[in-house]
Amino acid sequence: MSNQVLCCVVLCLLGANTVDGGITQSPKYLFRKEGQNVTLSCEQNLNHDAMYWYRQDPGQGLRLIYYSQIVNDFQKGDIAEGYSVSREKKESFPLTVTSAQKNPTAFYLCASSI
């Protein structure tokens, strides 16, 4: 491999890791005991007004749990039962999975938009 090509590959890979803004969801993995409430964190530094929480069960598509267009206001999505949210800051939209939620395996996704 020539030095020019190697240099380009290294610079491209370094550039791919540079991010000015983003959305962070935590924890990455979570195991919950039956009857236990747990809270998933969602933080964004993109200055987006709208934030969303989705759930995906194995073999299914994404389903909207809750969404928020502005601070201190949020609406239920298609499957809000067994969940609660708050939106005290523009940057944050935590989701609490309550003990009423029975299905043990799911993928949760937080998103934001302008």
Swiss-Prot record:
* Entry keyword set: Adaptive immunity, Cell membrane, Disulfide bond, Glycoprotein, Immunity, Immunoglobulin domain, Membrane, Receptor, Signal, T cell receptor
Q: Name one GO cellular component term.
A: alpha-beta T cell receptor complex
Which sequence ranges form a coiled-coil region, renumbered to this chain? none
Q: Which residues form the Ig-like domain?
A: 22-114
> Which cysteines form disulfides?
42-110
Where are the glycosylation sites?
37
Return any one Pfam family short name.
V-set
Q: Which GO terms describe its biological process?
A: adaptive immune response; cell surface receptor signaling pathway
Would the keyword Cell membrane turn up in this protein's UniProt record?
yes
| PROSITE patterns from the UniProt entry | IG_LIKE
Where is the protein localized? Cell membrane
Which residues are the signal sequence here? Answer: 1-21
Does Oxidoreductase show up as a keyword for this record?
A: no
Please give the InterPro entries that the UniProt record associates with this protein. Answer: Ig-like_dom (IPR007110), Ig-like_dom_sf (IPR036179), Ig-like_fold (IPR013783), Ig_V-set (IPR013106), TCR_beta_variable (IPR050413)
Per UniProt, subunit arrangement is: Alpha-beta TR is a heterodimer composed of an alpha and beta chain; disulfide-linked. The alpha-beta TR is associated with the transmembrane signaling CD3 coreceptor proteins to form the TR-CD3 (TcR or TCR). The assembly of alpha-beta TR heterodimers with CD3 occurs in the endoplasmic reticulum where a single alpha-beta TR heterodimer associates with one CD3D-CD3E heterodimer, one CD3G-CD3E heterodimer and one CD247 homodimer forming a stable octameric structure. CD3D-CD3E and CD3G-CD3E heterodimers preferentially associate with TR alpha and TR beta chains, respectively.
Function of the protein: V region of the variable domain of T cell receptor (TR) beta chain that participates in the antigen recognition. Alpha-beta T cell receptors are antigen specific receptors which are essential to the immune response and are present on the cell surface of T lymphocytes. Recognize peptide-major histocompatibility (MH) (pMH) complexes that are displayed by antigen presenting cells (APC), a prerequisite for efficient T cell adaptive immunity against pathogens.
List the protein's name.
Answer: T cell receptor beta variable 19
Organism the protein comes from: Homo sapiens
